[in-house]
Design a protein with these regions (language model features):
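Hydrophobic h-region of N-terminal signal peptides that target proteins for export
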Residues: 9-17
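N-terminal, post-signal-peptide metal-ligating segments of extracellular/periplasmic oxidoreductases
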Residues: 16, 27-29
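Aromatic-lined carbohydrate-binding surfaces of glycoside hydrolases
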Residues: 29-44, 49-59, 65-78, 83, ...
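Positively charged n-region of N-terminal signal peptides that target proteins for export
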Residues: 1-4
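Conserved short beta-strand edge segments in small beta-sheet-based binding/regulatory domains
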Residues: 96-99
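Short Gly/aromatic-enriched secondary-structure transition segments
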Residues: 87-88
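Boundary of Sec targeting at the N-terminus
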Residues: 17-19, 237
Length: 273
């Protein structure tokens, strides 16, 4: 019982002191968090600061960063701290994190911060993505690739990303409850590379039907994506409902709909009138 309680207390303690910025650093390069000290500061102003003394005053000649002299990144959100990390690596350490290389090897000794640096922005909401991006290579990303993308967004200050993964899961659940069969659902929901154009009310069923394991896979993936975005302090934008329904909804469900016709030869979903 004592061991169980001790384990529970340790788990609670670890959760209480979880630091998303340190986790991000360690994903960039294992052990990198030990070379930094990230400090979350309460402020209405979006900012980050880079320092190396902890008090904002360099009273001695700057020394290379080390275990007892870490690079200090302050910010009023984890995303802003991540921007500060990226700024330091790029402008102080000469390390450029690219979209195709999110894990550069950091030197054992990082360059010193010669003087305190502060950057602010009045742009409170920084949005990313549109529907089309979710049906390019992103349609087939796994959790490992999504982790890198969320890190990339954080490093570049994105705090309001569109989160459209798994929208088809919600639609499937709703249509099944309305009496549609799995086969009929498959004829309405598009395949992975065409989901964006289906969600934009341009076509039905093209590239489908989706296999049953796809829905569970994408539901699980979206839950991980949302959890990580929220952990970083982002505000994910979830798709709303625009009135789209299957083109046969009038016949099947007795709904008052408007026929949207064709889009480049594709049957479009109907719209609620």
């Amino acid at each position: 019982m004592k061991k169980l309680l001790l384990g529970l207390l340790c788990t609670i303690a670890l959760g209480a002191y979880a630091n998303p910025a340190d986790d991000l650093l360690n994903r960039i390069d294992k052990g990198a968090a030990a070379k930094f000290k990230t400090i979350l500061v309460k402020s209405d102003k979006d900012f980050f600061e880079i320092d190396q003394t902890g008090n904002g005053k360099n009273t001695t000649a700057p020394k290379p960063a080390g275990k007892n002299n870490p690079i200090i990144i302050r910010g009023n959100s984890w995303v802003n701290i991540a921007v500060g990390i990226n700024w330091y690596l790029k402008h102080h350490a000469g390390i450029h994190i690219t979209w195709n290389n999110m894990s550069p090897k950091l030197p054992n000794v990082l360059p010193a911060v010669k003087q305190k640096e502060r950057h602010e922005t009045d742009l409170k909401l920084r949005y990313d993505f549109n529907y089309c991006t979710f049906s390019y290579t992103m349609a087939f990303w796994d959790w490992n690739r999504w982790q890198k993308e969320i890190d990339w967004m954080a490093l570049h200050g994105i705090n309001m990303p569109l989160a459209a993964v798994g929208t088809e899961c919600v639609w499937r659940n709703m249509l099944l409850k309305l009496g549609y069969s799995e086969e009929e659902v498959g004829k309405f929901i598009a395949g992975p590379a065409f989901l964006a154009w289906w969600e934009m009310n341009n076509l039905e069923g093209w590239g489908g039907p989706l296999p049953q394991n796809w829905y569970k896979q994408q539901e699980t993936l979206q839950k991980k994506i949302l959890a990580r975005m929220k952990e970083m302090g982002m505000k994910p934008v979830l798709p709303g409902y625009c009135g789209m329904v299957p083109h046969d909804a009038k016949k099947r469900l007795g709904l008052n709909v408007t026929d949207a016709g064709k889009w480049n030869g594709y049957q479009r979903p109907a719209n609620l009138s």
